């Protein structure tokens, strides 16, 4: 096939329609990224970036100046296409104000948002109009001259900027509104009896469906490239990934102290507001809640926004949008190549809780070991084990240990989860069994009663992580190198899809790992306690992964 024919195919696939979803914790820079993507590109950007900022990147990749030239040439030939900035929070705002009784409900502090309460009625009228446009007309064919929805959304955005105080109460309320919509659907806010749209069959996709209808309507008004600011629920992200082949998730990352400082200084949050908002962002126990860590780790492209200036963030966005529009425009960086190996390795994991991959690369750039979290050799992964097999096959099943086939554990399994074909997690069930036992002993000795709710919390606190059957991905990568005679790991780099726990961090320190690149941050003190111990000159560099991953 001729190069011109290939270009023609990509023009049709990548130039006519694309969606970028942004995800990241509050203060990481999702809105800043969306503004960059929605603005025109300064003609002098590439020269300015090359003169003042390129050297910082070139220290990490000797090919970056050549990538920059390729990107600049592509933009000169194809031109920069600005994205339509679609604020998901503004759409939630419309849905909320579409229902009069919700506005003055005690569950929300609506009156505290507004600088002038007289603006509420006008806001409600505008929001009702926007909801009607989206719900009634998204399937009808429009002409590009009719830009009623585009203009109404601009009017709404200006209305919010002028009249609304986006403080911590506003953020908390909108986290609550998002949860309500994902749990109960749109029916609490929108009357479907007189709409051409129907209520989504699964409530968790209620917001996704509304955004999809909005995009469909805006496409009929002539818009082609969209940036969604922002997605913070994994099911919503998976909805867009499944529906649109040209959907790309950009994970925007910034270190927590930087994010916190931005919220306190730039957004007027108070110190006591930060932890509750952070907790709501990382609720992994409910399908309808925000779960930033899961969203970030599912990114197609990972960006850093730790800098005080926007130029580096802007370069990253331009770079990956160009790659999105023309796959193969430039080759992967060393970090992208090696992290892709770690990402691929995780699919070998038979763990039913999470899948992690790791790759150790020597100082000369050669792979020394690959690993994934899984059980030791001669053991059967959890994904292939079930309580039915344990209970019914007596002691003849090779997938179970001598302890698991003992009466004490088998009887507990029979009473706790019964006989079924689903895999079970030994660590979780054994921790629960031992936890209940310890609480029963405590109550018997002290005579103190403990409620069932407190008991559940205590069991989680009493869990013992050493009961897990699997070795961690990092351990397996280290051991693979030792097993096959790969030589010293001193001054090597560890690529892992989840940052090391304390146990793996200690092993990395002992082996002399000099750099650790991760995607998903592990929620413990391993970085501060273990990796930043002793002579600071010998601390390994710990960095969040930047670049393209998975299918992007």
Where are these regions (language model features)?
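P-loop NTPase motor core
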Residues: 57-130
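Small-molecule kinase domains that catalyze NTP-dependent phosphoryl transfer to phosphate-bearing small molecules
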Residues: 6-7, 205, 237, 265-317
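Short, surface-exposed basic-aromatic patches at helix termini and helix-loop junctions that form
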Residues: 78, 238-248, 506-517
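Extreme N-terminal, non-catalytic leader segments
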Residues: 1-26, 36-74
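Walker A/P-loop
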Residues: 31
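Conserved phosphate-donor/acceptor-positioning beta-strand/loop module used by diverse small-molecule
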Residues: 229-231, 240-267
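Short, acidic/turn-prone active-site loops that include or flank metal/cofactor-
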Residues: 48-58, 90, 252-258, 308, ...
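Zinc-dependent deaminase catalytic domain
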Residues: 104-122, 126, 132-214, 218-219, ...
């Amino acid at each position: 096939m001729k190069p011109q024919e290939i270009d023609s195919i990509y023009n049709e696939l990548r130039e006519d329609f694309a969606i970028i979803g942004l995800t990241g914790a509050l203060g990481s820079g999702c809105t800043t990224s969306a503004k960059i993507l929605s603005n025109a590109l300064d003609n002098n950007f590439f020269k300015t970036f090359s003169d003042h900022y390129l050297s910082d990147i070139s220290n990490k990749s000797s090919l970056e100046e050549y990538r920059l030239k390729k990107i600049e040439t592509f933009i000169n030939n194809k031109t920069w296409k600005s994205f339509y900035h679609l604020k998901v929070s503004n759409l939630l705002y419309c849905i909320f104000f579409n229902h009069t009784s919700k506005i003055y409900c005690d569950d929300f502090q609506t009156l505290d948002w507004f600088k002038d309460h007289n603006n509420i009625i006008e806001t409600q009228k505008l929001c009702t109009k926007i909801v009607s446009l989206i719900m009634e007309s998204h399937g009808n064919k429009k002409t590009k001259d009719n830009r009623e929805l585009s203009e109404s959304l601009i009017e709404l955005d200006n209305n919010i900027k002028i009249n609304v105080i986006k403080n911590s109460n506003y953020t908390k309320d909108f986290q609550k509104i998002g949860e309500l919509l994902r749990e109960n659907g749109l029916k609490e806010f929108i009357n479907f009896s007189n709409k051409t749209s129907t209520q989504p069959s699964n409530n968790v996709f209620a917001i996704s469906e509304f955004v999809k209808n909005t995009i469909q309507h805006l496409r009929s008004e002539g818009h082609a490239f969209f940036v969604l600011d922002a997605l913070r629920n994994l099911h919503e992200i998976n909805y867009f990934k499944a529906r649109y082949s040209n959907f790309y998730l950009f994970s925007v990352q910034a270190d927590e102290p930087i994010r916190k400082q931005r919220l306190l200084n730039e957004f007027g949050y108070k110190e006591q507001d930060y932890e509750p908002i952070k907790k709501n962002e990382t609720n992994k126990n409910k399908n309808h809640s925000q779960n930033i860590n899961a969203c970030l780790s599912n990114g197609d492209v990972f960006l850093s926004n730790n800098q005080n200036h926007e130029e580096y963030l802007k370069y990253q966005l331009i770079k990956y949008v160009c790659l999105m529009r023309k796959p193969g425009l430039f080759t992967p960086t060393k970090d992208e190549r090696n992290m892709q190996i770690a990402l691929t390795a995780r699919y070998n994991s038979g763990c039913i809780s999470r899948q992690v991959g790791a790759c150790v690369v020597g100082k000369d750039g050669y792979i020394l070991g690959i690993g994934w979290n899984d059980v030791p050799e001669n053991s059967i992964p959890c994904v292939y084990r079930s309580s039915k097999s344990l209970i019914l096959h007596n002691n003849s099943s090779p997938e179970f240990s001598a302890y698991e086939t003992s009466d004490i554990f088998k009887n507990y399994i029979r009473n706790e989860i019964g006989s079924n074909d689903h895999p079970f997690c030994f660590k979780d069930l054994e921790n629960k069994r031992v936890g209940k036992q310890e609480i029963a002993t405590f109550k018997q000795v002290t005579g103190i009663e403990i409620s069932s709710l407190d008991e559940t919390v205590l069991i989680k606190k009493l869990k013992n992580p050493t009961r897990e059957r699997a070795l961690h991905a990092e351990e397996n990568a280290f051991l693979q190198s030792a097993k096959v005679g790969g030589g010293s790991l001193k001054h090597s780099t560890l690529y892992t899809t989840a940052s090391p726990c304390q146990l793996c961090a200690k092993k990395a320190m002992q082996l002399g790992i000099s750099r650790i690149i991760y995607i998903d941050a592990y929620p413990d003190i391993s970085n501060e306690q273990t990796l930043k111990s002793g002579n600071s000159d010998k601390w390994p560099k710990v960095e969040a992964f930047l670049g393209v991953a998975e299918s992007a």
